């Protein structure tokens, strides 16, 4: 009886450890493939912000430039040879994406 309880605990702990979220998952926004990323204070990005009417002072996180969505990681045709990022605001038709964080798709 004690062996069965111990075995159940070991198996349960192993399964719990194996079900953590992968680091290639985007939990807070959309998965994007951007041609470049940078700070809002970068002169080229600041020019884009001026054209789009975005206040540079309001943006503190990484910015993605010329982005397209990545729909299914690992599916054919959905690779990202540039910078894969997870962005919280991609409402500028791919020109810029705000609140981005780099992720690793090679895991």
UniProtKB/Swiss-Prot annotation:
One of its GO terms (cellular component) is fungal-type cell wall. The gene is pnh3. SMART domains: HYDRO. Its main location: secreted. InterPro entries: Hydrophobin. Disulfide bonds join 26-86, 33-80, 34-67, 87-100. This is Class I hydrophobin 3. The keyword Glycoprotein applies. Residues 1-18 form the signal peptide. Pfam families: Hydrophobin. Keywords: Cell wall, Disulfide bond, Glycoprotein, Secreted, Signal. It comes from Pholiota nameko. GO terms for molecular function: structural constituent of cell wall. Belongs to the fungal hydrophobin family. Aerial growth, conidiation, and dispersal of filamentous fungi in the environment rely upon a capability of their secreting small amphipathic proteins called hydrophobins (HPBs) with low sequence identity. Class I can self-assemble into an outermost layer of rodlet bundles on aerial cell surfaces, conferring cellular hydrophobicity that supports fungal growth, development and dispersal; whereas Class II form highly ordered films at water-air interfaces through intermolecular interactions but contribute nothing to the rodlet structure. Induction: Expression is induced under conditions of inorganic phosphate (Pi) deficiency. Self-assembles to form functional amyloid fibrils called rodlets. Self-assembly into fibrillar rodlets occurs spontaneously at hydrophobic:hydrophilic interfaces and the rodlets further associate laterally to form amphipathic monolayers. It is found in: Secreted; Secreted, Cell wall. It comes from the Eukaryota. Glycans are attached at residues 35, 89.
């Amino acid at each position: 009886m004690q062996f069965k309880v111990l075995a159940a605990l070991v198996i349960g702990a192993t399964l719990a450890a194996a079900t953590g979220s992968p680091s290639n998952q985007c939990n807070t926004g959309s998965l994007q493939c951007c041609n470049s990323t940078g700070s809002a204070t970068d002169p080229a990005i600041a020019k884009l912000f001026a054209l789009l009417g975005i206040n540079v002072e309001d943006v503190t996180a990484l910015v993605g430039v010329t982005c397209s969505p990545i729909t299914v990681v690992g599916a054919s045709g959905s690779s990202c040879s540039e910078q894969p990022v997870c962005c919280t605001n991609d409402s500028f038709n791919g020109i810029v994406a705000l609140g981005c964080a780099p992720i690793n798709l090679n895991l």
